[in-house]
Curated annotation (Swiss-Prot):
SUPFAM superfamilies documented for this protein: Calcium ATPase, transduction domain A (SSF81653), Calcium ATPase, transmembrane domain M (SSF81665), HAD-like (SSF56784), Metal cation-transporting ATPase, ATP-binding domain N (SSF81660)
Gene3D superfamilies hit by this protein: Calcium-transporting ATPase, cytoplasmic domain N, Calcium-transporting ATPase, cytoplasmic transduction domain A, Calcium-transporting ATPase, transmembrane domain, HAD superfamily/HAD-like
Lineage of the organism: Eukaryota, Metazoa, Chordata, Craniata, Vertebrata
Cofactors that this protein relies on: Mg(2+)
Underlying gene: ATP10B
Protein name: Phospholipid-transporting ATPase VB
SUBUNIT field: Component of a P4-ATPase flippase complex which consists of a catalytic alpha subunit ATP10B and an accessory beta subunit TMEM30A.
Length: 1461
């Protein structure tokens, strides 16, 4: 749809002539100003006109096309409730089935029961569901009414002021004014914020579950407003994308009156449902309203997954339908045969009105339909309701398991999917993320390398080796220091001098206090408030012990920074001092960390305007700083630094200490900005400038203790990524402190107290494609435009400046040396399991940046291909970088991860790790968590070529197949062993397990080359698979590939947004509540806090849920078939007339009351094996993987047993009462009683756990039957005419035959079942049977039996001869295979390497791991050699054995036999 409106150009000219000022903005001229009318395509974009006097007509024309802000989540109205609810209920085939039977029963020729009685069950079900749906919809109506009537201030055009209105009155284009703690009523574009920096703080917990605050900034050009926003002065048109459900994606542009454009994104959008925090006032214009808001578009309702048991049950239901049809056919044919035996029409065969009789064929068809009505219970429709109730009970007990509760986070397991709990007991493959899932995701700065020099931080390493030194409850040795503004200057000078040396930074976390066995957070601060004492605190490790050697160089670098002048050359030198300064500046600046002080409240507290102490003190401080900045820098360094006491005296009592301060310590730090002749902001001031020489502590003494200056305010850093927070804390340990951050500038405090304010020109955020982040700043001392970049080493190394392009030969050699040594250190860090990041910089000229910024603004203003253009502009800037160094961050393994992985592996579960980390880091973590063992044969494949990948997969697969052939037992014929082509190994010998390590590029080659089948076949021989450098899309593709091709049950577990696709692709998705937000949790089926909880969740609760539900389903199917067959056998004695010997009300009560509760209790509370035994014997989990409790054989065995029991229950009473003159109901009552007794006793035999509740339910059901029968038979005189069951039960209770039959028949009926269960328990070889025997033993004997079991199950040690030999691979012509690291930049050498040489190289590398790193060694083999070498069993030589021992001593992280291709 094209919409043509008057452009605001002419109206703007008219307004300018009347004296209205022009609103300045950062724009790019893209449109011609001569055009008087502008055309917009409303089908592809959204156009928003402001609701003010100038655009009133355009707003009226456009806004009526958009929905209002009134929301309605109800499904019904008062008039549509009854018909629509019935229509929805009859969409279920079960209700249609019952309705079909009711209609059939209303036909006179097919009537079996009373018509009203047949309608009653269906009517009750429909009525109950209708009441439930009505109550739920009424609750939604009340909620909608409360939301729609919430108050908000909307700008009224006629009154030209903000008016209090309801949310439902908001329209697209309205101006909305919001205050602190108010909820955003619609999706609003932020135009004004009371924050002087144009920032609005949001809490998005209602959308994504994250409690940390988010920053939103006003649109460019509106951030410098010093007065209130005036809607009448807004003369811009907004064009943006159509409504969608992407919470983190938004793009559009603002067209100004001069037809220039300013682009904006999601950083300026306030989403509906968020809460304004720490911002007194925010004003914006409504972009999306009502059901078009992103929050409403994301309310798609709960996802429905069908469990494996339910899929199996649906198949068996079709078998039951087949049985029903067969029985009805027998009844129809039998009825025709029976009628054919009469030579004349019998008296009960009544003719129609014309006196004619039905033909035999038509009579048989009617009888077929009549038999369906009679045997309808054979289809267990109530089974679905029972299953839902059982699942609710299982989830209830699962959610209340204290073992799955995490004290640190105060969170327990969340069951977000109620219908797949039983699938937890059948998992065969687990796909896990690494960071935050296997590891803590609490990053700790471990070591770094700068300009090729490595700083190991040994003191930091020793401290970190102490397990959870700072996290233990009894060793909490720090207290939260709540420092006010005045405390910054209040410390005694002697305190500073006594704190010399490098000391670790103390944490400012709250102490944990035990309360009745559970831990809760107790504030240790002095400030009494309901809010947390630490605003925006992140649960990350902040303790860093500086390296003494690096600390000295940092001090020199800080002093060097002070000597810089405006004449600094454009091309920075590669000196160590300057590089160290730039390195720590990059750590401090290149991030998106939010800064606050520990005393900053969560919600802003306002003070009365009469309080002028704050303004007076700030004005004096600013005047003092302006005067002091006139001093020379050299004078400031020749003088000594001031003491805190003296500085406090000089400032006097004007320093504000109130918590309601509008400016925190960070704003005070940056209070002395000025503008020099160069046109850039030089924001640098020194604490030493404000006092005379000789007063207080010297600068040298201050630099000696950069990490212990407790007099300075304690800053809290809130980071989106734990990596960023760890780097900022590491820089803070060296006194490069991030003081404040705004959209316009970043302030950094140097070790000597000097504050530098960098103008923030542009921020290129991190994304999974670029794998890096950059900031463009203007240096306050030199005026240079500097690009600081950090990112993955695999990306940064390719973006560095080519040393060959450097004209200076010495500089070229130096660059190559730095690059090689940094890569060497990166490999060392990776082998130590550290996360690596490279730091680089680039100096950009003014002209280049101006040209690039113009392209960037055009990309931001683009609507169609905005993301592609932004990516392209980022790539144009992030190149020709200068390497500064790299960091190694430790991400500790979570507690219990190695034990959990080992246990899951014993349970027969294949574990794959899909991570985006580099290969060396992932492999190291895999060894640490026992995913890969020392004796594993590890295949590492790194290639981008499809042909090479196929050859490698074929050869590796061939070798593994041959080694598996060695494990097969010898073939025998009549007791004689047949000759074998390959030599066999002894039965005690075990061939080592294989592991596969593969990277993202190889995965691309596999998916693009149609090699998925070979890849999966290879993984079948591997115990563990490790996919490194994998993207979120690759993760989901792998999960779908394994799930669909192998037809196995899969589980994915992760904690980050990049794991969402993988979690949703698996049969069961588990999210971990970690440090990376709640997106993984919100998209998961279950949410846990620790990976170790997965062990009990699967092995115990998974086994129980599967075993209970599977056996309950089998029992339910058996119960219905057994009972219905009683009616079927009776048809052989009533001429297949569809008569019954049991009263119809008794039949209804049988399923409704008498046998409904025991299966529910059985499905919720039964425990076939105790939790302790299940955890001690993980092999028991394989019973669920193999579907031993419920499969095709168990179904048919139960069906045969049901037919047998029904035969016994019918024919023993028949023979007992044969020849007597009892009536039909007197004959049916014993059969009904016997059937109930047999079914309940069958249930009792299946129960493995007996409690008082079980006994009460079974006995109560049995007694209820007699109680209801006695009352019904005593009161029902004419209720079921003509055959009323009056006094039938009372008469049977006085008949001895009744007692004899009721006692003897169940025993005979259950004898085969009892014999089968006894034989299974005595001679059965299943693991479950053996475990049940062990479970019944006393605790001491049970523990001994479990130990004996585990000793028998433990595999034998791997003999020397059983280890496979690996030879280097012959390549296809022109292909290379790296024998060590995949990042080899040297040309490959064509040579042949024997097994011993490869093994020696590996062992030697491990023995010298701390001294050097493996170099770039590549090997390309001759075309005549085999890819993996010949497969043969060979004894290791003495030298090789010694080398193996060397490998064992040197590192536990390496495998005994590995091959990198």
């Amino acid at each position: 749809m094209a919409l043509s409106v008057d452009s605001s150009w002419h109206r703007w000219q008219w307004r300018v002539r009347d004296g209205f000022p022009h609103c300045p903005s950062e724009t790019t001229p893209l449109l011609s100003p001569e055009k008087g009318r502008q055309s917009y395509n409303l089908t592809q974009q959204r156009v928003v006109f402001p609701n003010n006097s100038i655009f009133h007509q355009d707003w009226e024309e456009v806004s009526r096309r958009y929905p209002g802000n009134r929301t309605c989540t109800t499904k019904y109205t008062l008039f549509t409730f009854l018909p629509r609810n019935l229509f929805e209920q009859f969409h279920r085939w079960a209700n249609l089935y019952f309705l079909f039977l009711v209609i059939l029963n209303w036909m006179p020729s097919m009537e079996v029961f009373h018509r009203e009685i047949t309608m009653l069950p269906l009517a009750i079900v429909l009525f109950v569901i209708m009441i439930k749906d009505g109550m739920e919809d009424f609750k939604r109506h009340r909620f909608d009414k409360a939301i729609n009537c919430s108050n908000i201030r909307i700008y009224e055009r006629k009154e030209q002021t903000y008016v209090q209105k309801c949310w439902k009155d908001v329209r697209v284009g309205d101006f909305i004014q919001m205050k602190c703690n108010e909820i955003v009523p619609a999706d609003i574009l932020l135009l004004f914020s009371s924050d002087p920096n144009g920032i609005c703080h949001l809490e998005t917990a209602s959308l994504d579950g994250e409690t940390n605050l988010k920053q939103r900034c006003v649109v460019k050009g509106f951030s410098q407003q010093e007065v209130q926003f005036e809607p009448e002065l807004f003369h811009n048109t907004i064009v943006c994308e159509k409504p969608n459900n992407h919470l983190n994606k938004f793009k559009g542009y603002m067209e100004h009156p001069d037809q220039t454009r300013t682009g904006f994104g999601c950083e300026s959008l306030l989403l509906r449902g968020c809460t304004i925090r720490n911002t007194e006032m925010a004003v914006g214009i409504v972009i999306y309203a009502g059901h078009e808001t992103k929050a409403m578009l994301n309310n798609s309702g709960p996802r429905y997954k069908r469990s494996k048991i339910e899929r199996r049950m649906n198949i068996d239901i079709f078998f039951c339908i087949g049985i029903l049809i067969l029985m009805c056919l027998i009844g129809a044919v039998g009825h025709s045969i029976w009628n054919g035996t009469f030579e004349e029409h019998p008296p009960f065969d009544v003719p129609d009105a014309n006196g004619s009789f039905l033909p035999s064929a038509l009579g048989g068809f009617y009888m077929f339909l009549t038999m369906i009505i009679l045997l309808q219970v054979l289809i267990p429709i109530s089974l679905y309701v029972s299953i839902e109730l059982v699942k609710l009970g299982q989830v209830f007990f699962l959610s209340n398991d204290l073992d799955l509760y995490d004290e640190e986070t105060d969170l327990s397991i969340q069951c977000r999917a109620l219908n797949i709990a039983e699938d937890l007991g059948q998992i065969q493959y687990i796909f896990s993320d690494k960071t935050g899932t296997l590891t803590e995701n609490k990053m700790v700065f471990r070591r770094c390398t700068i300009m090729g020099s490595e700083y190991s931080h040994q003191e930091n390493a020793k401290r970190l080796e102490t397990p959870k030194e700072l996290d233990s409850d009894g060793e909490e040795w720090t207290q939260y220091q709540c420092l006010s503004f005045s405390a910054r200057w209040a410390q005694d000078p002697a305190t500073m001098r006594s704190q010399k040396g490098a000391q670790p930074l103390r944490r400012s976390q709250s102490a944990r206090v035990p309360i009745q066995g559970h831990y809760r957070q107790r504030s240790m601060g002095h400030r009494e408030s309901s809010q947390p004492p630490v605003a925006f605190s992140s649960s990350i490790e902040k303790d860093v012990t500086p390296d003494k050697n690096l600390l000295t160089k940092v001090r020199d670098a800080a002093l060097w920074l002070e000597t810089l002048s405006d004449s600094r050359p454009a091309k920075a030198s590669l000196s160590t001092t300057s590089s160290i300064a730039d390195f720590f500046l990059a750590l401090t600046i290149c991030n998106s960390v939010m800064v606050s002080t520990t005393t900053e409240p969560r919600q802003r507290v306002t003070i009365k305007p009469s309080s002028k102490a704050l303004g007076t003190s700030l004005e004096k401080i600013q005047q003092l700083f302006q005067k002091l900045k006139l001093l020379s820098l050299s004078q400031s360094f020749s003088s000594t630094a001031p003491s805190d006491t003296d500085l406090g005296e000089s400032l006097g009592a004007n320093v504000a200490t109130t918590d309601s301060d509008e400016r925190d310590d960070a704003s005070v730090c940056s209070g002395g900005d000025s503008t020099d002749d160069g046109g850039y902001r030089s924001s640098m001031w020194d604490q030493g400038d404000i006092l005379e020489s000789g007063s207080g502590t010297s600068l040298e003494e201050a630099l000696e203790a950069p990490a212990t200056d407790l007099a300075r305010p304690e800053f809290c850093y809130e980071a989106e990524s734990p990596d960023e927070a760890a780097l900022v804390h590491a820089a803070h340990a060296y006194s490069f402190t991030l003081v404040s951050r705004t959209p316009e500038q970043v302030t950094v405090r140097l070790p000597q107290g000097t504050c530098l304010t960098f103008s923030l020109l542009c921020t290129l955020g991190f994304d999974s494609v670029r794998k890096r982040m950059s900031v463009v700043v203007r240096h306050p001392l030199t005026g240079e435009i500097v690009v600081y970049t950090k990112g993955a080493d695999s990306v940064i190394m390719d973006l560095l400046e080519d040393p060959a392009c450097v004209p200076d030969i010495n500089m070229e050699k130096k660059l190559r040396k730095i690059r090689a040594r940094t890569q060497k250190h990166l490999d060392l860090y990776a082998r130590d399991g550290l996360r690596t990041l490279c730091i680089a910089k680039k100096v950009v000229s003014e002209e280049d940046f101006r040209r690039w910024a113009s392209f960037r603004r055009e990309a931001e203003a683009s609507l169609d291909n905005r993301d592609e253009l932004l990516m392209e502009t980022a790539q144009h800037l992030e190149n020709q970088l200068t390497l500064l160094g790299a960091t190694g961050i430790e991400d500790r393994l979570q507690e219990g991860v190695p034990d959990t992985i080992a246990t899951l592996r014993e349970a027969g579960i294949q574990l794959w790790v899909l991570t985006g980390d580099k290969q060396e880091t992932a492999v190291n973590i895999a060894h640490s968590c026992r995913l890969l063992n020392q004796t594993d044969t590890v295949y590492t494949i790194n290639t981008e070529n499809q042909e090479t990948c196929e050859s490698i997969l074929n050869c590796a697969l061939e070798e593994l197949k041959q080694f598996r052939e060695l494990q097969k037992p010898d073939r025998k014929l009549f007791g004689f062993r047949l000759p074998s082509k390959t030599p066999s190994i002894t039965s005690e010998a075990v061939v080592p397990e294989a592991g596969l390590v593969i990277d993202g590029k190889t995965l691309n080659a596999i998916f693009q080359g149609k090699l998925e089948k070979k890849f999966l076949e290879l993984t079948q021989y591997c115990r563990s698979v490790l996919c490194c450098r994998s993207t979120p899309l690759q993760k989901s593709m792998i999960v779908k590939l394994v799930r669909d091709k192998l037809r196995v049950m899969t589980l994915s577990i992760g904690d980050g947004a990049n794991d969402v696709s993988m979690i949703q692709a698996a049969d069961i998705g588990i999210g971990i509540s970690g440090q990376e937000g709640m997106q993984a949790v919100m998209s998961s089926d279950f949410a846990i806090t620790r990976f170790k909880h997965l062990k009990k969740l699967l092995l115990v609760h998974g086994h129980w849920c599967y075993s209970r539900l599977a056996r309950m389903v089998v029992y339910y199917l058996y119960k219905n078939v057994c009972y219905v067959n009683l009616l079927f056998w009776y048809q052989f004695f009533c001429g297949f007339s569809s008569s019954t010997m049991i009263d119809y009300w008794q039949m209804i009560f049988f399923n409704l009351f008498f046998t409904s509760l025991p299966p529910l209790v059985f499905g919720v509370l039964d425990k076939d094996i105790s939790a302790e035994t299940l955890l001690a014997l993980p092999e028991l989990y394989k019973s669920g993987q193999n579907s031993e409790c419920y499969n095709l054989s168990t179904f048919w065995i139960s069906m045969v047993d049901a037919f047998y029991q029904s035969l016994i229950c019918f024919f023993i009473p028949y023979l007992a009462y044969k020849g007597s003159d009892i009536d039909v109901f007197t004959f049916g009552t014993p059969i009904n009683t016997i059937s109930l007794t047999t079914i309940l006793l069958h249930q009792a035999m299946e129960m493995k756990t007996w409690t008082i509740f079980h006994g009460v339910v079974l006995l109560g059901s049995f007694l209820m039957y007699f109680l209801v029968s006695l009352l019904y038979n005593a009161t029902c005189v004419i209720c079921n005419s003509p055959t009323n069951p009056y006094w039938v039960m009372e008469g049977q209770l006085s008949n001895p035959t009744f007692y004899l039959v009721c006692f003897l028949t169940p025993v005979v009926a259950l004898l085969p079942r009892y014999f089968f269960l006894s034989l299974q328990g005595t001679c059965g070889k299943s693991l479950i049977s053996k475990a049940q025997k062990i479970d019944k033993l006393p605790p001491d004997k049970r523990n001994l039996e479990i130990q004996s079991w585990r000793s028998r199950q433990r595999p034998a040690p791997v003999p020397e001869v059983a280890r496979p030999t690996h030879h280097p691979v012959s390549s296809i012509t022109g292909q290379d295979f790296s024998a060590s690291t995949p990042k080899s930049s040297n040309p490959p050498k064509r040579k042949h390497v024997e097994e011993s040489v490869l093994h020696e190289q590996r062992c030697g590398t491990e023995c010298m791991r701390d001294d050097s790193c493996s170099g770039d060694s590549s090997a390309q083999l001759s075309s005549g050699e085999h890819l993996l070498g010949p497969n043969r069993i060979m004894a290791y030589s003495r030298g090789q054995t010694d080398m193996c021992r060397c490998s064992k001593r040197s590192s536990h992280r390496r495998s005994q036999s590995s091959l990198t291709i």
